[in-house]
Each structure stands twice: as structure tokens, then as C-alpha cells.
Curated annotation (Swiss-Prot):
Keywords linked to the UniProt accession: Chloroplast, Membrane, Photosynthesis, Photosystem II, Plastid, Reaction center, Thylakoid, Transmembrane, Transmembrane helix
Chain segments annotated as transmembrane: 17-37
This protein's name: Photosystem II reaction center protein L
A single cellular component GO annotation: photosystem II reaction center
Classification lineage: Eukaryota, Viridiplantae, Chlorophyta, core chlorophytes, Chlorophyceae
């Protein structure tokens, strides 16, 4: 059973893209708030 499970790879890919999306939203929120408060 050395064959990797494709289902697990899909889950890890979705989790990574979710983290990138959250990071992008966080950066945009910080830039937007600094633009507003200046």
C-alpha cells in the first residue's frame, strides 16, 4: 500500500488554497484599513 491516496492529496490542496485565500484577505484588509485611517 505504498500508493498515495488521491483523495488525501485533494484535501491537502484545498487546505493550502484556503490558507492562501485567508492570507490574501488578511493582507487586503490591512491595506484597506491603513488606506481608510490615513
Amino acid at each position: 500500500m505504498a500508493r498515495p491516496n488521491p483523495n488525501k492529496q485533494v484535501v491537502e490542496l484545498n487546505r493550502t488554497s484556503l490558507y492562501w485565500g485567508l492570507l490574501l484577505i488578511f493582507v487586503l484588509a490591512v491595506l484597506f484599513s491603513s488606506y481608510i485611517f490615513n
